[in-house]
Amino acid sequence: MKKLILFYLPDCNVSKLFEERLHKALALPEFAGRFNLIRYNLYTDTGRQEAKSIGVNDAPTAYCNGSVLRGVQSDYSIRKYLRSILEQS
């Protein structure tokens, strides 16, 4: 199972939309059970430290194995991103 990190801002509609689309994609049979989603709030010290350690400075952002997906994305773009991560291994 791959560790997929989501960096978000809790009061941001863009972050909420991004997270909803990500959850929708992760529920598809193609991806179900293949990712462990970890959420970091960028308003917390832990979230900021984790983001800094991998070079992320904005939200919403998804990160897995060096691959980064930033900003509002379509459902298609999120699925494409997840497929590319799975193909890396």
Positions of the model-derived regions?
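Local sequence-structure signature of Cys/Sec-based thiol-disulfide redox active-site neighborhoods
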Residues: 1-31
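Thiol-based oxidoreductase modules, predominantly thioredoxin-like and allied folds used
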Residues: 7-9, 31-47
